[in-house]
């Protein structure tokens, strides 16, 4: 998919393209997936030296690479994004992501990165550490992530301490590698998007 965004006449069009690789991940009522992909975002792209981010930076694709996990919709979307890339790098961007993910599945994810991701998520939850946002507001929004789609499950994303404990145990299994294989590599419900600047 290709799209455009507006820039001013004074802005350069060179290396101002956004590239994204997006996959739909289950549904928001699955509390394990809801937390697991937040952890995978950290382990694959957000942490220092994360494999997908490092591979894209080493290839010179974009001047910033980040992940996004949008779980506030019935079918959550997990994305890898390269900012300020070149449109001609779109195929290489997708290839590097897929090859890096295949290597991660084959050799295993860094267990320390997974544990750090779990610890970070659990700390934020326990301490209600949401930065500048009031905790009541964020708790309410977390309730809406499930409540909008099932009136009987408004609190599943607030009752997550058991989920964190289970994820901690799953670090020593191939659970996370299977998630990558199923939802990021074998999954055809997704898109690759190139957004180019236009004056």
Please identify what each model-predicted range represents.
Residues 32-44:
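Active/ligand-binding-proximal structured segments within catalytic/core domains
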Residues 1-9, 13-16, 20:
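Hydrophobic, small-residue-rich alpha-helical packing segments that form membrane-like cores
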Residues 15, 29, 33-34:
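Disorder-to-helix initiation segments
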Residues 173-174, 198-199:
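Extended non-catalytic domains of envelope/secretory-pathway proteins
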Residues 15-26, 53-168, 188-198:
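M16 family metallopeptidases and their MPP-like homologs
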Residues 177-180:
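Conserved functional hotspot residues or short segments at active or partner-binding sites
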